[in-house]
């Protein structure tokens, strides 16, 4: 609610006149915001509790709806707070929001969406078919568990080019010789 409070302070608006809030985030962040258990996201079956409940027929969507009061938001107490649906596992509501923003389900042409962060989501599709995948990317940025190589720091190779003569040229962060 801190960012929302800051945004409200930046605009001349009475927070009690805010009646709708939309919340998106990766599966874990969205579920934490709505005080859902995230236990099942971090281990097998790697799915939100809302996905599991939907598969069991206990709900018809992975969307969540609460009130401003229950979410402790500085808005009208009866404001509807929507959590957009999770697509699957680690492809969360933020990815669903991207798909809505570009109108992917209405497009004839192929559309690609990349959300690069701790988990990277890749979505490719159009109105005929949509494919989505997620993979952990944090270790690649942080240098975690790298057996050969290094984090993205000075001395790390950031670009490899092959010219017409068959010679490789390396781009190195910070210039100089790669470590």
Walk through the language-model features, giving the residues of each.
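Nucleotide/phosphate-binding catalytic cleft detector across ATP-hydrolyzing
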Residues: 1-21, 26-112
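Glycine-rich phosphate-binding loop of actin/hexokinase-like ATP-binding domains
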Residues: 39-55, 97-178
């Amino acid at each position: 609610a801190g960012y929302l409070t800051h945004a409200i302070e930046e605009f001349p608006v009475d927070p009690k006149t805010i009646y709708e809030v939309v919340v998106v985030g990766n599966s874990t962040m969205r579920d934490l915001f709505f005080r859902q258990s995230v236990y099942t996201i971090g281990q097998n079956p790697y799915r939100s509790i809302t996905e599991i409940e939907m598969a069991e027929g206990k709900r018809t969507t992975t969307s969540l709806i609460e009130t401003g009061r229950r979410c402790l938001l500085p808005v009208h107490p009866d404001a509807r707070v929507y959590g957009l649906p999770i697509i699957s596992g680690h492809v969360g509501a933020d990815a669903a929001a991207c798909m809505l923003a570009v109108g992917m389900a209405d497009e004839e042409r192929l559309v690609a969406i990349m959300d690069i962060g701790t988990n990277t989501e890749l979505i490719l599709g159009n109105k005929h078919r949509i494919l989505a995948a997620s993979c952990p990317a944090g270790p690649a940025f942080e240098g975690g568990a790298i057996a050969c190589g290094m984090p993205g720091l000075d001395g790390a190779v950031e670009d490899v080019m092959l010219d017409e003569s068959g010679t490789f040229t390396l781009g190195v962060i910070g210039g100089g010789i790669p470590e």
